[in-house]
Each structure stands twice: as C-alpha cells, then as structure tokens.
C-alpha cells in the first residue's frame, strides 16, 4: 500500500475568461417601409382581429370555427416568426435556404388556407348575439385572404426576379 502524505498543498488558479455568444443582427428598416413589409404587418394585425373575434364567442358550439381558429392562430404565429426573421435579417445567416421560394410557398399556402377558413366562417355565421363578432371575423378573414394573395404575388415576382422580391432587397436570390 502506498503511504498518503499528511499534508496536501493546493493552489488556486485564475478562472478562465468567460466567453459570451452573441448574434449580431441589424434591424432592416427598409423592409418595414417596403410593400411586402407593410403587407406582412397588416397580415399580423388583421390575423389578430380574426382569431380574437372568434375566440370571444362560444366557438366550441360550431365545429367549423375550430378550423378557423386553427388556421388564423397558426398563420398569425408563423407570420410573426417570419417578420422577426426578415426584420432582423436572420435569413442572411441561412444562405442555403431558397428564401424567395420559401416565401412564395408560405404565402400561397396561407392564402389558400385562409380562403377555406373564410368560407367556413362565413357559412356558419348564426343570427343572434354573436352575429356581429362572427360576421366581422368573416369580413377580416377575406381581407386576410386578399393580403396573403397580394404577398404571394410579390413573392412570385421576387422568386422570378422580375421586380422587388418578397422581402425588399434583403432576401438573397
């Protein structure tokens, strides 16, 4: 067996410098001033109106309104995420993603989904106390459909390279 010393001397070493992780992102104010940026902000505002108007009613009594809520809340959250990505120029950190095509597909699918949600909403507006809420949500649903259709058009132009692309001049082609 080995003998262990009665005393042990220890030393305190200096701590390693702490490392921080930072993402340097710049806010693209030009995107906010562009037509696609204005459309995206309008889609977020109108989408919020659609789902809050329906959520303020007893929507669980009409099954079709569940679909409208699903579409409106899902696309509202995805639009907010897209706004953050484009506003902070985070898409430039992912050059392998074909952003013009992604935007074209997103907006086209969103327009189609909102069209189905509008039809379901408009077909189920009952008379009575909540008629105003559901009628207004149907109106804003078709407005949202038109906004997403307009965004699809600008995304198509950006994808084809025939004009300003879907996120101003910031999306790499």
UniProtKB/Swiss-Prot annotation:
GO terms for cellular component: apical plasma membrane; endosome; membrane; myelin sheath; recycling endosome membrane. It is a multi-pass membrane protein. Residues 56-67, 120-138 are extracellular. Belongs to the MAL family. This is Plasmolipin. It holds the Pfam family MARVEL. Keywords: Cell membrane, Endocytosis, Endosome, Membrane, Phosphoprotein, Transmembrane, Transmembrane helix. GO terms for biological process: digestive tract morphogenesis; endocytosis; myelination; regulation of endocytosis. Residues 31-160 form the MARVEL domain.
């Amino acid at each position: 067996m080995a003998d262990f010393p009665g005393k042990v001397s220890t030393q305190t070493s200096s701590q390693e410098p702490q490392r921080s992780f930072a993402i340097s992102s710049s806010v693209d104010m030009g995107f906010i001033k562009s037509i696609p940026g204005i459309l995206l902000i309008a889609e977020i505002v109108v989408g919020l109106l659609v789902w809050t108007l329906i959520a303020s009613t007893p929507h669980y009594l009409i099954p079709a309104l569940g679909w409208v809520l699903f579409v409106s809340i899902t696309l509202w959250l995805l639009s907010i995420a897209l706004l953050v990505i484009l506003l902070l120029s985070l898409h430039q950190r992912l050059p392998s993603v074909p952003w013009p095509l992604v935007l074209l597909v997103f907006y086209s699918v969103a327009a189609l989904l909102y069209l189905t949600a509008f039809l379901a909403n408009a077909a189920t507006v009952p008379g009575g106390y909540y008629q105003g809420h559901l009628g207004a949500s149907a109106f804003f649903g078709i407005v949202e459909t038109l906004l997403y259709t307009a965004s699809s058009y600008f995304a198509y132009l950006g994808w084809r390279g025939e004009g300003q692309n879907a996120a101003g001049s910031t999306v790499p082609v």
